[in-house]
Amino acid sequence: MTLLHQLTLSDAREALMRGEITSVELTDALLARIAAVEPQVRAFLTIDAEGARAQAQAADARRAAGDTSPLLGIPLGIKDVISTQGVRTTCASKMLENYVPVYDATAVARLKAAGAVLIGKLNCDEFAMGSSTENSAFQQTRNPWNLERVPGGSSGGSAAAVAAGEAPATLGTDTGGSIRQPAALCGITGLKPTYGRVSRYGLVAFASSLDQIGPMARTVRDCAIILRVIAGADPFDATCTDHPVPDYEAALTGDIRGLRIGVPREYFVAGMQPEVESAVRVAIDVLRDQGAEVREISLPHTPYALPVYYLIAPAEASANLARFDGVRYGLRVPGESYFDELERTRGAGFGPEVRRRIMLGTYALSAGYYDAYYKRAQQVRTLIRRDYQQAFEQVDVIAAPTTPTVAFPIGAHSDDPLAMYLEDVCTLPLNLAGLPGLVVPCGFAAGLPIGLQLIGRAFDEETLLRIGDAYQRVTDWHTRMPDLPVE
């Protein structure tokens, strides 16, 4: 018998539509699951049990009145860098520990309009800067498959909550792999949409030319359902395009015959675990067996993506985080003068990784270094984008690893920032090019999940979702859940 916390989003939706369960019953079951496993997983920073029950009751009343909204009565979690009206939004930082937004992010407002029940806010690396959720100022989220391992980051809480059965789906954000990497490490499905597909209004910015909000869930179908709700033009975000939003769920036909899949040799990096490479190549063979045409391709500027990213992203972060000065909102530490107060506030409010990236970014933008570093990085970014454009003249989708290894032990990279940055070597090129990426579970090594990454043309999430769904129709990796101790 499937327990309520084991239901996928689409299964829960069907059960609600058929009247087999109510939203109140589903919400209570998930709150009970959170109470049972949260002491071990620690995915949530804020649990809004009272608000969730009230929303669930309202959803049941709407359904009784004939409402058929696509997410009516479905409980979801939200990464804690996305603004939620009346619910604390901390960015996992002491700087915003007590900040309560007075408005919803556009993505959250659209979820609410579609009937979703917001159950709480999820842990992440501070201001979304990290690959392990170890940079949170408040707690360490643990990988539900092995509580001594990281869940990935920065959307580690969003991934762990889905894997642990605390929520059927969540919202995460992806600046350099922060949806896809934790999805792979926690054995769930995650989608980074095309830059400009989903409004960033209400997202606390890390790197404005790279950030994107996207869904994390158990299945590709679940991600398709959520994407259709949150995608589309927004007058509050000038970078969000009016590109037509298709019916993504209708695109899940299961037929991928004739689709051309490229496998880039540069993504199989030195130091990749053999088990990871093997699982990814076996997954690609499954797609070939389903009728796809597979060929090797080259993305020659991929090796430069990591240094380019770590010039551009910190530069944008240093500008975006300048607003946290202790004057208007957030933490304020008194000082003898304005500059002393500013130094004390930012020193106490920001953790070491955030301070490191602000310093990197400020250096890259400073006089005398701008042309040598930041401007040159933007030029190489154009070459990386051009690599993808040329590749997509030959293929429809690119298939590659998501991470070079499975989840590493908590603390393994704490004293080695470069080793931590290398965890994103397979994911961050997409952000530089603004392309969509989908991760689906494709195997295990030493009891830890492995993810296959699918990369698509700009605004062609349909094809990505179609291939990912076809893969999940003939495999069962996405159906597996960890056996967690409960309290």
From Swiss-Prot:
HAMAP family documented for this protein: GatA (MF_00120)
Q: Which organism is it from?
A: Roseiflexus sp. (strain RS-1)
Q: Where is the active site?
A: K79, S154, S178
Family, similarity comment: Belongs to the amidase family. GatA subfamily.
Report which gene this protein is encoded by. Answer: gatA
Q: Tell me, what is one Gene Ontology molecular-function annotation carried by this entry?
A: glutaminyl-tRNA synthase (glutamine-hydrolyzing) activity
- Residues in coiled coil: none
Q: What is this protein called?
A: Glutamyl-tRNA(Gln) amidotransferase subunit A
Q: Which domain of life is it from?
A: Bacteria
Q: Keyword set for this entry?
A: ATP-binding, Ligase, Nucleotide-binding, Protein biosynthesis
